């Protein structure tokens, strides 16, 4: 029987949102899961699993599938948004009228605002006001492994210390899911956006056939780009050596569960952008993130040569091999002070 209030309302019933809802419910919490497609929600309720992406993971009894947005939002004090970054602002506008006076917002979306490159915290503040507590979770997480209960660790940053502790307690499970609090709200957000871009580059490199040396060099210099941009925005450099930085970057650049990596591999193998996106069949966050990270880097005058070349491939039709040669042919640099 459903209680008066759930521990968490998850907005976004894709693979990752569903995996997080399953994890919370498996921890013994009542969780409400809402998605924008009523037919899809009805199918989730009928099957009691996500047949498309997580067919082997049954929903715990405490996971409640909800089709009505107002009911989903008011069911819990804490609202977890797990949607693609390009619709993040639109979703906040949708949920705003239904938020409770004591609502708190957390998101697992990795990216920046479409076109503007703004951090999602700025979108949330502009849309929902200054008083609502905000938080973000990020780190090396593939939905299938998380839903299956395989060991996973993430970073959590919040604007409010009490909210951070509450979320850590809700999410943390000693058997499989470890949650690290991190006070760097900017850095935890930024890492998840930049790693998507670098993962496309790693995929391109492997698709061309450049080998492990090249992939590792690209990951390492990609981390340098992430750190430079973070420093310009006031992030803590240590964050980028943690779960939301290096952890997520390595995972996304090296494992074929990553859509961004697979997308890049197809480009390196000769697919055009549209064909590669169609073949993936799900949102490739790094495609839009590349444009937005470039905008943000230009705003802060941060040199990001890998990001620039990936942008040239995705939006200007540059050949992937030519992009790689452009990177290799750059002038000599000092490792710690050059781009």
Curated annotation (Swiss-Prot):
Pathway it belongs to?
Membrane lipid metabolism; glycerophospholipid metabolism
Q: Which reaction does it catalyse?
A: sn-glycerol 3-phosphate + NAD(+) = dihydroxyacetone phosphate + NADH + H(+); sn-glycerol 3-phosphate + NADP(+) = dihydroxyacetone phosphate + NADPH + H(+)
The organism named in the record is Erwinia tasmaniensis (strain DSM 17950 / CFBP 7177 / CIP 109463 / NCPPB 4357 / Et1/99)
Main localization, broad class: cytoplasm
Protein known as: Glycerol-3-phosphate dehydrogenase [NAD(P)+]
* List of residues binding sn-glycerol 3-phosphate: 110, 139, 141, 195, 248, 258-260
The record's Gene Ontology biological-process terms are: carbohydrate metabolic process; glycerol-3-phosphate biosynthetic process; glycerol-3-phosphate catabolic process; glycerophospholipid biosynthetic process
Catalytic residues of the enzyme:
195 (proton acceptor)
Keyword Lipid biosynthesis found? yes
Residues in the signal sequence: none
The protein's GO terms of the molecular function aspect are: glycerol-3-phosphate dehydrogenase [NAD(P)+] activity; NAD binding
